[in-house]
Amino acid sequence: MVASGYARTYRANSVLTASPGQLVLMLYDGALKAIGLARVAFENPPEDPRRIETINQQLLKAQSILAELQNGLNLEAGGELASTMHRLYDYHNRRLMEANLRKQVGPVIEVERLVRELREAWAQMLAQNDGNAADRVRSVA
């Protein structure tokens, strides 16, 4: 119990002290965690009473995080890249909605792969630019 309280405090402080670029990375991590938990729940036996609830909760959480990433885009300053990212986040959300409605794992696996690629690219950009450029290009996250 105490350890989880420390973990919550650490996460809260991490968010408060993170650069905009690091916040985007945290959002990707959160989306991947939720998507992964939903994917694992799909593997649970159909008679598991919490299976459907877990899938639904985790997919909704992932959709909410992806919506935050999408809402953070500055379509004017970000130009074509921001527009492309906006459409990509929209696609991710539609696929997760489809997975949730039809209770199919395929779209979850697809979106997990796509979001992981975005997360890796973002992390690489942060590492290469030491976070400085990430602050300037937050509008296209």
What name fits each language-model region?
Residues 1-11:
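Acidic, low-complexity proline/glycine-rich segments
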Residues 105-141:
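Preference for long, well-ordered alpha-helical segments
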Residues 45-50, 99-106:
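Short helix-adjacent coil turns
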Residues 65-83:
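Short, solvent-exposed, charged loop/turn and helix-capping segments
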Residues 40-69:
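Alpha-helical segments in soluble extracytoplasmic regions
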Residues 35, 39, 66, 70, ...:
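A structural signal for well-ordered alpha-helices, especially hydrophobic packing surfaces
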Residues 31, 78-91:
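Short, well-ordered alpha-helical segments
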